[in-house]
Design a protein with these regions (language model features):
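Catalytic/RNA-binding core of pseudouridine synthases
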Residues: 1-228
Length: 228
C-alpha cells in the first residue's frame, strides 16, 4: 500500500512506458498524480535510464529518498527485445526520421546474419546517434541535428553480453540483446547494417529488464495512478 509518508521516505516503482511518451512525460505524470493525491507541494521523482519516445517497456522510477538510488539502477545491465529492418537506413537510425537510403538485400543470407551478430559480443567502442539526448556544449545532440547543424558525438565504451536473432520474417529481424549501461540499440542496429555492407533501421524496441527488475513486474502509468 502507498501513503504520503511512504513516498517521501522513498519508493521504487516499475512502469511500462507507452509508445510515444518521453521518459520525462512518465516522471511528470507520476509526480503530478502523487502531489495531487496527497497534497504534497514538492517531491522528488526521477527515472533510471532514458527510453526513446519510439521505445516501450521497463522504466525504473525512483520517488522521494529513493532518488539517491538512481545511479545504481542506471549502472545495471539492460535487456531489450526489438525488430530491425535490413536494407534501409534513416538519419536517426530508427523511424523518427524518414528513410534516406535503400540497399539491395538479394545477397544477404541467414548464416551471415547469425555470424555477424556474434561479432558484436564483448567490449567495444560505440558512437551514439546524432539524434540522441547526449549533450554537446550544453545542448542536446538531437536539437542540433534537427537544425541541420554538424554534430560530433563522443564515442563511449560499452559491452554486449548477449545478442540473439530470429529471422523468420526477413528482411525484418527480431532480436534480443543484453548490454551495459549507455548502449544505444539504434547504433548497434546501424553498425550491424554496416557490417553487412548494407543498411539497417530499428523499427521496434522494448526494454525487458534492468538488472533484477523485469517488465513482468511493471504497471502501466494508469494502473499505478489508480493504485496510489
Amino acid at each position: 500500500m502507498f501513503s504520503k509518508e511512504s513516498f517521501i521516505e522513498g519508493r521504487t516503482i516499475l512502469i511500462d512506458k507507452p509508445l510515444g511518451w518521453t521518459s520525462f512525460d512518465v516522471v511528470k505524470k507520476i509526480r503530478g498524480a502523487i502531489k495531487e493525491k496527497y497534497a504534497i507541494k514538492k517531491i522528488k521523482v526521477g527515472h533510471a535510464g532514458t527510453l526513446d519516445p519510439l521505445a516501450t517497456g521497463l522504466l525504473v522510477i525512483c520517488i522521494g529518498k529513493h532518488t539517491k538510488k538512481i545511479q545504481s539502477y542506471i549502472d545495471e545491465k539492460k535487456t531489450y527485445s526489438g525488430v530491425f529492418l535490413i536494407g534501409k537506413t534513416t538519419p536517426s537510425f530508427d523511424l523518427e526520421t524518414a528513410f534516406n537510403k535503400v540497399f539491395s538485400i538479394e545477397n544477404i543470407n541467414m548464416e551471415k546474419l547469425a555470424l555477424i551478430s556474434q561479432n558484436f559480443i564483448g567490449k567495444q567502442t560505440q558512437t551514439p546517434p546524432i539524434f540522441s539526448a547526449k549533450k554537446i556544449n550544453g545542448k542536446r545532440a538531437y536539437e542540433l541535428a534537427r537544425k541541420g547543424e554538424e554534430v560530433q558525438v563522443k564515442k563511449s565504451e560499452i559491452e554486449i553480453y548477449d545478442f540473439k536473432l530470429n529471422i523468420d520474417s526477413f528482411p525484418k529481424v527480431s532480436f534480443s540483446i543484453t548490454c551495459s549501461k549507455g548502449t544505444y540499440i539504434r547504433s548497434i542496429v546501424s553498425d550491424f547494417g554496416k557490417a553487412l555492407n548494407n543498411g539497417a533501421t530499428l523499427i521496434e524496441l522494448r526494454r525487458m529488464a534492468s538488472g533484477k527488475q523485469n517488465i513482468l513486474d511493471a504497471k502501466t502509468v494508469e494502473e499505478f495512478i489508480s493504485s496510489i
